[in-house]
Amino acid sequence: MIFTTSKNSSFKAEFKELLERGKMDIAHVSATVGTIIDEIKSNKNQALKEHITKFDKWTPVSDEDLKISTESMSRAYENLDKALKAALHLSYDRIKAYHEKQKPRSWFDDEPNGTILGQRVTPVDSAGLYIPGGKAAYPSSLLMNVIPAQVAGVQNIVVCTPTPENEPNELLLAACHLCGVSEVYKVGGASAIAAMAYGTETIPKVDVITGPGNIFVATAKKMVFGDVNIDMIAGPSEIGILADDSANPSHMAVDMLSQAEHDEMASSILITPSQKLADAIKAEIENWLKILPRQKIARESIEKRGAIIVTSDMQEAIDLMNEIAPEHLEVATLSPFELLPLIKHAGAIFLGHNTPEAVGDYMAGPNHTLPTGGTAKFFSPLGVENFMKKTSIISFSAKAINEIGEECALIAKIEGLTAHEQSIRVRLVK
């Protein structure tokens, strides 16, 4: 773990290295992913079955084997522990309520001369949602992807999730039933992205693909973008924390480890103007590591991609964090809302000592599918707008076209587009 201060002579180099760590290099998998996509485009279901045999260690006999039955999803839901079922329902309700507030509205504006201008917002026809499966299956990811698509009004929702050894994750199936999803396919990785982007005999082509995944999934999404829309190209999970002396060192340590336990590539960075707090957090990290079930993963992550940085003041800490533009940003300070206007770049901001990042993963309401690797400088969280499109509406009356027609025709003439010019002039009153 990098443990440093901004006053160190080597800090600029250390910080630059820290920023580079967060970037995802897809060059080494691009050729493999490109081949997978080409095989799906050419051989469709047959290629899917071959890829499932190779990567998930089971062989679909028929095309029907690719799809998970609604009966198995219903059964998984009924078998859920009562408390867990209630928790999933509460999560669903909170996520839906938040995303309902996001929904963009169509608008129209009438001008006195009879011109009508507007913007119509409508859902895409179909969406493909990729949900990681196997041991890393997260029902929360299903809720976070399905709900905004449903709120947007998408009629056809397809879910793809890998099922190693043909054993679907029961929690994931239960969440599918809770959300009312019926088209769920046992396909993962780049193969799933290609299948949803181009269609097979079983899996329909969709308009937009969303959802998290490993480097092969991220690379496939990047490659199919343009043939379909995508939400973002997300890399390993990351957390940034701004903290002052009012923060609890033990809380800060476990918050950092909440990302580190995801995988070895996850990033956890805390920046504070307090050397005392930094020292205490470093000690608490070791205490927490001793008791975590995923200690090995968390330790490797925190050692290779963790950092605690001490700055001269909070403004410098904020400036550094804006440069990082983390996926998740906790502001664990005495007056977090006073700092909020100074924070420019983050996927989601968690304000105050009682707002751990984990509450945003499951229950707060905002989406947990967030931009990573510094892309929060230009990408936004997954939301309802990812499943909607805007169409411009234009209507001119005879009076309106005559009021601006000459000026419009003049610009067309200057651009050398005679048919454009004449299509306006023929409508003008001489």
UniProtKB/Swiss-Prot annotation:
Known catalytic reactions: L-histidinol + 2 NAD(+) + H2O = L-histidine + 2 NADH + 3 H(+)
EC number of this enzyme: 1.1.1.23
One Gene Ontology CC term in the entry: cytosol
Cofactor(s) needed by this chain: Zn(2+)
Note describing how the cofactor binds: Binds 1 zinc ion per subunit.
Pfam families: Histidinol_dh (PF00815)
Alphabetical list of Gene3D superfamilies matching this protein: 1.20.5.1300, Nitrogenase molybdenum iron protein domain (3.40.50.1980)
Involved pathway(s): Amino-acid biosynthesis; L-histidine biosynthesis; L-histidine from 5-phospho-alpha-D-ribose 1-diphosphate: step 9/9
Binding site for substrate: S237, Q259, H262, H328, D361, E415, H420
MF GO annotations: histidinol dehydrogenase activity; NAD binding; zinc ion binding
Keyword set, alphabetical order: Amino-acid biosynthesis, Histidine biosynthesis, Metal-binding, NAD, Oxidoreductase, Zinc
Positions annotated as active site in the UniProt record: E327, H328
Residues binding Zn(2+), per UniProt: Q259, H262, D361, H420
Class of the enzyme per the UniProt entry, highest EC level: oxidoreductase
CDD domains associated with the record: Histidinol_dh
Function according to Swiss-Prot or TrEMBL: Catalyzes the sequential NAD-dependent oxidations of L-histidinol to L-histidinaldehyde and then to L-histidine.
NCBIfam families per the UniProt record, alphabetical: hisD
Record-stated family: Belongs to the histidinol dehydrogenase family.
Protein name stated in the entry: Histidinol dehydrogenase
Gene name linked to the record: hisD
